[in-house]
Regions:
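Short glycine/proline- and charge-enriched loop/turn segments
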Residues: 10, 86-94, 231-238
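Predominantly a Rossmann-like dinucleotide-binding segment in NAD(P)-dependent oxidoreductases
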Residues: 37-42, 47-163, 292
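Active-site rim elements
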Residues: 95-101, 160-164, 238-245, 264-272
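NAD(P)-dinucleotide binding in Rossmann-like oxidoreductases
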Residues: 126-127, 132-139, 146-251
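Beta-strand-loop-alpha-helix segment that lines the small-molecule cofactor/substrate pocket
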Residues: 1-48, 63
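Non-transmembrane alpha-helical segments in soluble domains
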Residues: 4-7, 30, 57, 108-112, ...
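A general structural signal for well-ordered alpha-helical segments in protein cores
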Residues: 26, 53, 107-108, 249, ...
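C-terminal helix-rich "cap/oligomerization" subdomain common to oxidoreductases
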Residues: 34, 180, 210, 215, ...
Length: 312
């Protein structure tokens, strides 16, 4: 509704991911984008602005990896962050669209960027097994739950219960994805990981890269020689006032400012259609988890393509 009002008012909108919470809203947004143009909605898929993403795009332009064959990736968050999800309005799928949509659409978009095409089949398993009553630390002799209440939560629909939460979201999930070109992704997320990480390894016909957004490193090797062709650690920037999303928030703000106000000739690295695609993938991943079936996205992409959003 907010996006619609902004478009009707003729303004350019910046919308935080995932911009929609379900498929019905996705098709409603598609109608709006078809009418007003996809360039009128900018999106906060911030990982594409990160130094990791910039370096990977440069390496891919140099054909350092060849054809991408497979990716292994994860996004894990600390217990206090998991406690936040169990208490915040995001704990309700009707509001947030579910954990993998709300939190991990960043990652799904990032890996689609690397592969260079859409997912075509997904399968998923997961559940809520950590933030449940019988796993409360109080029952295990702990004196308090302060670590899970670290994030102050005054605000809409917030509650204080963590292990007795009325949440209907998962606290852990795995997904496997097959892309249109045959590449595959294995993805894992968990919201109770004290030494959190957001790690990935991408493997291609000519080389590989591995990195961790949290720890800051990114390394790449050539398959034929075994030699290291890239080795950087961006973590130092996190300690110098650029911590938001591993320094990517500031990079995104600069790029968007240049795009809107400084006549930048460089297109933004991500758009609203990318965000819609990542959202649909997340929704189908949850559909697989809920139905215990492999989900084919062929019809989903046909429906989206009928709006001709890539060619407006």
């Amino acid at each position: 509704e907010h996006i619609q009002k902004g478009l009707e008012a003729g303004v350019t909108i910046f919308a935080e991911k995932p911009i929609v919470a379900n498929e019905e809203q996705t098709w409603q947004l598609a109608e709006l984008i078809k009418k007003y143009g996809k360039d009128k909605v900018l999106v906060g898929l911030v990982l594409r602005y990160s130094k990791h993403a910039r370096s990977i795009r440069k390496l891919m332009k140099e054909d350092a990896f060849g054809k991408i064959i497979s990716i292994e990736a994860s996004e894990h968050i600390m217990p206090w962050h998991g406690g936040f999800f169990m208490r915040n309005w995001r704990r309700k799928t009707s509001y947030s669209g579910g954990f993998i949509l709300e939190k991990c659409c960043h990652d799904l978009d990032f890996y689609s960027m690397i592969v260079g095409c859409r997912p075509i089949r997904v399968a998923s398993f997961g559940g809520r097994n950590a933030f449940v009553p019988d796993q409360s630390p109080i029952l295990q002799g702990e004196k308090n739950l302060d670590v899970y209440l670290e994030y102050n939560l005054p605000g809409w629909e917030s509650k204080e219960e963590v292990f007795d939460s009325d949440a209907d979201i998962v606290d852990h999930q795995v997904a496997i994805i097959e892309y249109e070109n045959g590449a595959t992704l294995a993805f894992h997320t968990n919201m109770k990981v004290p030494d959190e990480f957001r790690r990935f390894a991408l493997i291609g016909t000519k080389g590989m890269a591995e990195g961790d957004f949290v720890r800051g490193y990114l390394k790449a090797h050539n398959s034929h020689t075994g030699k290291k062709i890239f080795d950087e650690n961006f973590g130092a920037a996190f300690q110098q006032g650029t911590k938001g999303h591993y320094g990517a928030d500031q990079l995104m703000l600069k790029d968007i400012n240049d795009y809107l106000f400084n006549n930048s000739s460089h297109p933004l690295p991500v758009g609203v259609v990318n965000c819609m695609e990542a959202g649909l993938v997340a929704m189908k991943i949850d559909e697989s988890r809920e139905t215990n079936q492999i989900i084919d996205l062929t019809d989903t992409w046909k429906k989206l393509d009928n709006y001709n959003l890539q060619n407006d």
